[in-house]
């Protein structure tokens, strides 16, 4: 299946490369190059980026911070990643806008749904930073929410693995990779696709989710073009 308007969910950890913290410029440039190719192909691209390479709210809470405060710090981390990715894309002459749910007018536009859609219609990449703007919500939930708001055809979750497995493939060499799954199976079996709120949002709005390996050469383009890579989660999908 080919798509027109897509939402790409990037984890903050994906921007680290082989480092244990921060941003690897070479990785960001490679991701930007792939996104640029997709834009040149005529697709409308929105992006939600996490902040776990800099700060993760739930870990901060576990270390003694108030959870809401820790989540706000994590939201700010996502903006750092969003601006970094924007810079890499604009160096490739890809017009890009960052919109944030928390006002940061010196560095980003406020999130306005109609403006975001207009940017996409004009061929600009839109990167959504600072999550939903509310604590206790993950960036996976942000991806599902923004996808519904902008009428995206699909959510692509780019990860370090090539799909969804029935157990951890690092611990179990016999782990089975699924090709397709339905929302209810994912929710009932608590598979680590996205958190349950994000899955439920996609289910309620009939938005398919494609989980694929970000680091396979050309995988972003292949996924957007509708090739069968990774695992697809959808309402009509059989478990296979």
UniProtKB/Swiss-Prot annotation:
Catalytic activity: UMP + ATP = UDP + ADP
Enzyme Commission code: 2.7.4.22
Any single Gene Ontology cellular-component annotation: cytoplasm
Molecular function as annotated in GO: ATP binding; UMP kinase activity
Protein name (database record): Uridylate kinase
Activity control note: Inhibited by UTP.
Pfam families: AA_kinase
Binding site for UMP: 51, 71, 132-139
Keywords linked to the UniProt accession: ATP-binding, Cytoplasm, Kinase, Nucleotide-binding, Pyrimidine biosynthesis, Transferase
Protein location: Cytoplasm
Principal localisation: cytoplasm
InterPro entries according to UniProt: AceGlu_kinase-like_sf, Asp/Glu/Uridylate_kinase, Uridylate_kinase, Uridylate_kinase_bac
Oligomeric form and interacting partners: Homohexamer.
Chain residues that bind ATP: 9-12, 52, 56, 159, 165, 168
Function: Catalyzes the reversible phosphorylation of UMP to UDP.
PANTHER family in the record: URIDYLATE KINASE (PTHR42833), URIDYLATE KINASE PUMPKIN, CHLOROPLASTIC (PTHR42833:SF4)
Pathway the protein acts in: Pyrimidine metabolism; CTP biosynthesis via de novo pathway; UDP from UMP (UMPK route): step 1/1
Natural source organism: Synechococcus elongatus (strain ATCC 33912 / PCC 7942 / FACHB-805) (Anacystis nidulans R2)
Family: Belongs to the UMP kinase family.
Entry superkingdom: Bacteria
Any one of the GO BP annotations: UDP biosynthetic process
């Amino acid at each position: 299946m080919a798509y027109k308007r897509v939402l790409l969910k990037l984890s903050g950890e994906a921007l680290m490369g082989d480092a244990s913290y921060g941003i690897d410029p070479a990785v960001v440039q490679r991701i930007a190059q792939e996104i640029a190719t997709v834009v040149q192909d005529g697709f409308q691209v929105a992006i939600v980026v996490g902040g776990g390479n800099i700060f993760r709210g739930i870990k901060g809470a576990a270390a003694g911070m108030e959870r809401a405060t820790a989540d706000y710090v994590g939201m700010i981390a996502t903006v750092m990643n969003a601006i970094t990715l924007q810079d890499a894309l604009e160096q490739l002459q890809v017009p890009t806008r960052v919109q944030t749910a928390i006002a940061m007018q010196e560095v980003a536009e406020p999130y306005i749904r109609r403006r975001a859609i207009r940017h996409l219609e004009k061929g600009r990449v839109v990167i959504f930073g600072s999550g939903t703007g509310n604590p206790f919500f993950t960036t996976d939930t942000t991806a599902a929410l923004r996808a519904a708001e902008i009428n995206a055809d699909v959510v692509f979750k780019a990860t370090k693995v090539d799909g969804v497995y029935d157990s951890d493939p690092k611990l179990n060499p016999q782990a089975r990779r699924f090709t397709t799954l339905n929302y209810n199976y994912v929710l009932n079996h608590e598979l680590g696709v996205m958190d349950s709120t994000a899955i439920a949002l996609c289910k309620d709005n009939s938005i398919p989710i494609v989980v694929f390996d970000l680091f396979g050469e050309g995988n972003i383009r292949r996924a957007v073009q509708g090739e069968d890579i990774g695992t697809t989660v959808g309402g009509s999908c059989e478990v296979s």
